Design a protein with these regions (language model features):
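Conserved helicase motor core of SF1/SF2 NTP-dependent helicases
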Residues: 112-115, 122, 126-135, 145-150, ...
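Short glycine-rich substrate-engagement loop in P-loop NTPases that contacts/grips substrate
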Residues: 190-216
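A short acidic, often aromatic-flanked loop/helix-cap motif at beta-alpha or helix-coil junctions
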Residues: 32-37, 211-215, 296-299
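Walker A (P-loop) ATP-phosphate-binding motif of ABC ATPase nucleotide-binding domains
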Residues: 141
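Short, conserved catalytic or adaptor-binding loops enriched in Gly and charged residues
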Residues: 15-22, 199, 280-287
Length: 299
C-alpha cells in the first residue's frame, strides 16, 4: 500500500491524480482478504468498471488472475457485498451487477478470466507471433475455429491486449490492429481500446477491414492484424472495397494475421465464402501448425 501511495508523487503516473483536490478514493477492507483474494477482487473491479458508461479510463495496465487459493470459494459473495456497498455511495458509477454483465463491453472485455482452453490458445498465439516477428516472417496466418459461444471474441481481445502489455513492459514498438466488419462490434472494441488507453498511446488500433486495407501498404506491413468474425470478410468488391478477397489483402499488409472463424455463421450472412477458398486458408494454417480449435461451450 505504501508503494502504491508513493507512486502518487510521480507526476507521470496515474496515481498522481490521487493528490488532486477533487480526487475521491474508496478504501475497501475485509477480514478474509489475503493477497490472492485481493488481486482477484481488483481484477473484477477493473473488469466491471470498464463496462460502466461513466468510466472513461481504467488506468491499471493489466489484470493478474489468481488460480486456487483459500478462501477462493468466498470470492463471489465477498465481491457482491463490496459492490452493493459501493452502489450505496454512487448508483450511477456502480450499476447493478446484472446490468454490468448484460453490457456488450463486459462480454467482449479482455479482462475476463480465461478458461484453460482459452489460456492455452492465447499462449500459443503469442508464442507463434513472437517467433514470426523475431524471424521477420510475413503473411503468417493463425486460424482459430470455434462455434458461437466458445469464447472467440474474448480470446481475440485478450490476446490483442496482452501483446500490447508485453510490448509496453519490454519497451518495444508494436503495430497491432483489431479488425471487424460489424458496426456494433467495432464500436464496442473502440470503447474498450479507449478505456484501456490504447487509442491515446497508439492511435486508431481498431478499424474495419476495408479501412485497414486502404490505409496500409504491402511494402510496410504492420506486425499483427486480429480479425474477429472472419465470416464477415468480403470475397468480392462491394461498396468502398474494390478488391477480390479481404483476408488475402489483410495478410499482404500484416506479418501475422489471426482470424476467428465460425463456419456455421456463413449460412446466415450475405457474404458467401466458397468452400475451397476457406479450406485453402485453413490448410495453410494447419501446415504451419497454426490451427487452433475451441470446443468448450461457455454459454
Amino acid at each position: 500500500t505504501r508503494q502504491h501511495y508513493d507512486a502518487a508523487l510521480d507526476k507521470s503516473r496515474w496515481q498522481s491524480k490521487l493528490l488532486e483536490k477533487d480526487a475521491s478514493l474508496f478504501i475497501i477492507g475485509h477480514e478474509h482478504f489475503n493477497k490472492s483474494l485481493t488481486l482477484d477482487i481488483e481484477n473484477r473491479l477493473m473488469h466491471y468498471m470498464m463496462s460502466v458508461d461513466r468510466v472513461k479510463h481504467v488506468h491499471n495496465l493489466r489484470d493478474n488472475p489468481q488460480t486456487s487459493y483459500y478462501p477462493m470459494e468466498e470470492l463471489d459473495d465477498i465481491f457482491s457485498k463490496i459492490w452493493r456497498g459501493l452502489r450505496k455511495e454512487n448508483k450511477d458509477l456502480f450499476p447493478t451487477e446484472s446490468a454490468i454483465k448484460d453490457s456488450a463491453i463486459y462480454k467482449a472485455s479482455p479482462l475476463h478470466k480465461l478458461t484453460k482452453e482459452q489460456e492455452k490458445a492465447r499462449d500459443l498465439i503469442i508464442q507463434k507471433v513472437s517467433k514470426a516477428l523475431e524471424n521477420k516472417e510475413t503473411r503468417q496466418l493463425i486460424f482459430i475455429d470455434g462455434e458461437a459461444g466458445t469464447g472467440k471474441t474474448v480470446l481475440n481481445s485478450s490476446t490483442f491486449y496482452e501483446l500490447y502489455c508485453q510490448a509496453e513492459e519490454n519497451n518495444r514498438n508494436l503495430k497491432c490492429f483489431l479488425l471487424v466488419n460489424h458496426d456494433e462490434q467495432i464500436t464496442v472494441y473502440e470503447q474498450i481500446a479507449e478505456k484501456l488507453g490504447l487509442i491515446e498511446k497508439y492511435g486508431q488500433v481498431v478499424s474495419k477491414p476495408t479501412t485497414f486495407i486502404n490505409n496500409h501498404s504491402k511494402d510496410e506491413p504492420v506486425d499483427i492484424a486480429f480479425v474477429d468474425e472472419a465470416h464477415l470478410l468480403l470475397t468480392q468488391g462491394k461498396q468502398s472495397y474494390r478488391g477480390k478477397n479481404q483476408l488475402n489483402d489483410i495478410m499482404d499488409r500484416a506479418r501475422v494475421t489471426v482470424v476467428m472463424f465460425d463456419e456455421n455463421q456463413i449460412l446466415t450472412t450475405e457474404q458467401f465464402w466458397e468452400a475451397q477458398i476457406l479450406e485453402q486458408y485453413r490448410n495453410q494454417a494447419k501446415l504451419e501448425e497454426n490451427h487452433i480449435v475451441l470446443k468448450k461451450q461457455l454459454r
